[in-house]
Structure formats: structure tokens, C-alpha cells
């Protein structure tokens, strides 16, 4: 039965793509370079840390750049300027989406534009930032946009059983679609014990089509956040090398690949009483009543003193209502945030391509 489903999906993907090749459907072309960062599987490949990495490379090379994202699961419509290159203009993740806001707070000088219609966002960039190159998030499937350079990320933790179309597996497209990429990065390489069959299959397609590729590793840092003042809300942030001893922690996250977060956080030897895992881009504000009820019940059960989570989750948790923040302050709850960064092995191979797109 799955064979039939796979055949139908593959044919649909190929047919849709062929409409653009035959100019039946038209691609929008822009005068500035567009670097696409995407994947062929659902969630957890590390697109946001990779966008952050590319933005930092552009800064080092003094290449003007802007990040464009659809702001997945944001509640706003139209074009939203999260960061104008000088300051963050919106701090509400419900309006911006969690990942664009996280990038705006980290990058500080990179314009961040979100719009559920990427084409509209690119037209805005054309007017507002005409001399910039675009880092276009999650756009490998955006066939209606002509992209200059296609980077595809492939998670080394993906298993062979995941190489099926959703909902039977994690694929958005067949592995053969990797042939459209200009560059492939195999992410989270240091978390995989060995190259599994899924990576081997993807690598076969990449090598067959002579596509340049690299491996990337991830590293992390951890910081402690506490509430200094409730009205107005003020937070104190303290970088840490390790977790305080004897702290009982509740692990909480809503990301695409929670297992890699759990695996990465083990280096800090956390004393985890329980894990609270939600779907990717979990909306804490919309589910605040349910979330707080779970937190309070687990607090009664375990008496934890801290919450171990990701920066992507934390920007949404600290945006909860004043009532929830007050409760966190009353029990003196500490938040321990694990921040993920990527490191490319032999990164010069990719940097050469980025340089060629600059001025």
C-alpha cells in the first residue's frame, strides 16, 4: 500500500516541478542574490541555527544581507519587519513567529522580514534593502521563486524508516529531489554514532549528481535566567559553564527534534525529574491555561527548582501573561536555556560560494 502512496506522491512532486521547467507556471526573478536554506524532511534539520551561521559569515565578509522567513505559525498576516537592521521592532512571537524573533534578538544588525507569502516579502526587500542578498528560510519547496543558490540540510539522526512520505515517515519530497540542490549539508554529525542507512542513501544521490557537500557539528552553551522584577518585568541573565548542583529540573521543549536537544543537554548533567515535550513551534500563549496547569501539577509532584528549555521556547514562555510570570517569580523558578550553534567541517568550501554572491 505504501508503495502506491510513494509512487503517487513522487509523481505529484515531479509533475508540479515540471510545470515550472516548462514555463507553464512562472518563477519570480529578483535582481538580488537569493540563498535558499531548506530540507526535504519535516523539522529538526537545524535550519534556524544554519541561517544564524550564514548571517554571521555574511557579517564577517561584510556582505549586506537580510533574512526572509514566513514566520511559521505566526498569527499575523502581511509583511512584518521584525528587525530593520538597527533595532528589533516587534517582540511578540505571536506576530513574528518564534524563530524570526529569536534571530532578531541574536543577530542585532540583520534585517529580519516575515510574511506568509515569501514573494511579497521579497518585493518589500527590493524596495527597502535593494543592495542586500537574501537568506531565504525554508524555501527548497518554493518553486515559484528563482533562487541563486540552493542549500539543503539533511539531519544525520534521521533513520531509514523515516525516509517515507509524511505521514508514514518524515519526507516532504523523495530523496531524488536532492539533485536540485547546489550544496548539501549533513547536520548534527557529531550526535550520530555512525553514518546510518538514511545518510548513506542521501549521500549516494548527492555523489551521483556531483553536488558539493559538507558535514556540520553542533555545540551548545547554557545560561540561567531569573525574574528580577515583575512590574515591569525584568530578567537577569547569567552565562554558565555548568548547571548548579542538586537542582531538580523539568525539561520542556516544543521543537522539531527534541531527542537531539535532550542528547545535547546531557553534557550539563541535569537532574531531570520529567520531560514535557510539545509539537514543533508550540504556541504557549494560546495554550497557556493548559500549559500552566501541567507545570503546576508537576511542581506539586516533583518540587523542581528550574526549567531546562531552548531559546526558541523561552522567548514564548517569557511572553506569557503577567499572572503566569508572577507565579514563576513566587516559586523563584529558574530558567536554564540551552543555545545551539553549528560548526561546519571544511567550511571554506561553502564560504567560497557565499563570497561569489557578494559585491
Which role fits each region the language model picked out?
Residues 17-87:
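Walker A (P-loop) phosphate-binding motif
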Residues 221, 278-283, 327-359:
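Short, flexible loop segments at boundaries between secondary-structure elements
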Residues 159-303:
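C-terminal accessory "lid"/substrate-recognition subdomains
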Residues 64-68, 151-152, 248-252:
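Conserved beta-strand elements of the Class I
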